[in-house]
């Protein structure tokens, strides 16, 4: 399932399989990467760091799960990952998504897309 929580200013979201042991039990060879990127264009007021972890299957590149932590509307980004999971996307397919850009709302490269690119680059 997909979940979001907020404690004071900190927002967290998670979806899918993140635990490597559980992924192996399900027949996957998991690989995870964690990145930290800006929530909006860096020059825009209110920009903050967002940390994204994605887990994928090493053999197929299929996205298995993800988590997000940050203070600037971070948790809602978990819906992008949940949608990709529902579509059984690979991290390469997620990386190519054309997410909206406007400085008040997001950086040119959304943190989820940056994470997908990093995971995709670590696959054989």
Language model features with spans:
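N-terminal periplasmic "start-of-domain" segments of outer-membrane beta-barrel proteins
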Residues: 1-7
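Flexible, glycine-rich terminal cap/loop adjacent to redox cofactors
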Residues: 7-15, 24-124
């Amino acid at each position: 399932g997909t979940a979001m929580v907020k404690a004071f200013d900190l927002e967290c979201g998670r979806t899918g399989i993140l635990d490597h042991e559980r992924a192996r039990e399900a027949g996957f060879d998991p690989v995870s990467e964690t990145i930290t990127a800006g929530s909006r264009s860096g020059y825009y007021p209110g920009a903050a760091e967002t940390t994204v972890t994605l887990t994928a299957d090493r053999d197929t590149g299929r996205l298995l799960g993800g988590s997000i932590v940050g203070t600037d509307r971070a948790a809602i980004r978990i819906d992008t990952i949940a949608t990709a999971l529902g579509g059984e996307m690979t991290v390469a397919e997620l990386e190519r998504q054309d997410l909206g850009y406007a400085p008040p709302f997001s950086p040119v490269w959304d943190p989820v897309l940056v994470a997908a690119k990093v995971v995709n680059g670590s696959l054989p």
